[in-house]
Amino acid sequence: HDIGINQIRLTPPPVIYNEFPEQQLDFALQRKGFEVVRTELTQGVRLDIPEDELLGSFVNKTRTAFRRAEKLGLKFRVIENPTQAEFDRFWEILVENRAGLGVTPAHNRKEIELLHNLVPENLMMAVVEYEGQIISLIWNFGCNSRTVLEFYMAHQEPFQKLRPVPFLT
């Protein structure tokens, strides 16, 4: 019977974010005529590749950018427990990067710090440094034992020519 609803919008998390992937809801909705308008997962990367084969698994453009960044002296560093100064730098680069795209971060700084304080074991920050200065960063969220969500990635525009982002991905 008709209850006056002609459209429902759902944004479920990608199935790989679940500890036990299942798609019963997707199947049931599609069987009733619903359709997927857009999917949020843009890329998935296998992480069980031996480290010495990892670079070879990337597309040529990414491999070239990675090698160039390496030759230019960029350094990759994982930050397990960010200091306040590193958190400040993360926020500064993120806000500047998003402003250049005409947007603001989806979360405010207070929310990000709260998340970090609630589940620090699920969060990982990594940075790319050039001449001792953080120029690019990524903040990852461990969804489960098999999946890591790239929560935020940003770089400083003046250093884009050094191609720091492939170092983070």
Each model region followed by its residue ranges:
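Conserved acetyl-CoA-binding loop-helix of GNAT-fold acetyltransferases
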Residues: H1, Q160-T169
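Alpha-helix C-cap/termination motif
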Residues: D2-I3, L118
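Conserved GNAT acetyl-CoA-binding A-motif
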Residues: I3-V15
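A conserved beta-strand-loop-helix scaffold within acyl/acetyltransferase catalytic domains
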Residues: P12-K161
